[in-house]
Amino acid sequence: MTSELEIDNYKCIICDGNRFKEVFNLEKISKKPYRIIKCSNCSMISIYPIPSKDFIQRHYNDPLYPKSAYFRNMTINFKGSPEVRLFLKGLNLIEKFYPNKGKILDVGCSSGIFLNMAKDRGWETLGIDLSKDFVNYTKKNFKLDIRYGFLKDFSFKENSFDVVTLWDLIEHVREPKELLKEVCRILKPEGIVLILTPNQNSLIKKTTNLSYKLSFGRWKTPANVVYDIHHLYYFSKKNITILLTKIGFKTVYIGKEETILNRIIGEESDHWIKKNKFMVFGLRLIFFIAKLTGNKNKLLILSRKKRILTNII
């Protein structure tokens, strides 16, 4: 049985607890000095220790970052790419719950495709990203207002935006609670935040955890693929809803979406794929079953800022 860890200088972002259990030791899996830990009280999963701000900025400004397989279809020639269908679904959801088009901020906007779609639909758009290459790319190709930096760097006025979007962002942030507080502050009353983040209770996560346990830690490759050191927090439907409620939001929609598998294994070489063909086949099978059963790898959440905020943490 996994022993409990008490970490004095680290608290769970959901319940403020400081007792945790180790899920994975990434040093044993990938020789990276981190652990994946689970809160003993509320089961929130995170990485420990949290990487530094400088480490995060260096990662997003690596010249290879915008060229990775994850962004292969996220260029000016985006029409018809499967990733864009999710952006379209998100935009339709936003307009369903917030039909009066206004000002939209995309935090972590990458190549600007979502903002370009929103602009074409009549929204006033603004984007922020930590990749200077993406900021320059988006300005050049889409002529959008994109700025480099963290959200708090800009000190936007209260009630500035109608909508804020966090596409595949919140799991990468060192302090997601503080991020959501700032989002709440700059949103107008009854404004919308849309979040896309990996689903910790997805079939792929459950299968990865089980395979690691059944192999007594010997089969490390799935865990190394699924638990990325740049994902700092792993949310479930339950704990993301709790966090949003504490901040001052009412969640009005939660759906499950699938990650496009090639955005995961596309990072690997042909040699790696051939060497791990059994695992790649297994991943394809798991994604197929997850699609049939609805136990997909992503959560799409839409929450509304409460008109009157009380007891905000």
Question: Predicted segments — roles?
Answer:
Residues 171:
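Active-site beta-alpha loop architecture of Rossmann-like, nucleotide-cofactor-dependent enzymes
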Residues 1-159, 163-167, 177-180, 256-257, ...:
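Conserved N-terminal segment of class I S-adenosyl-L-methionine
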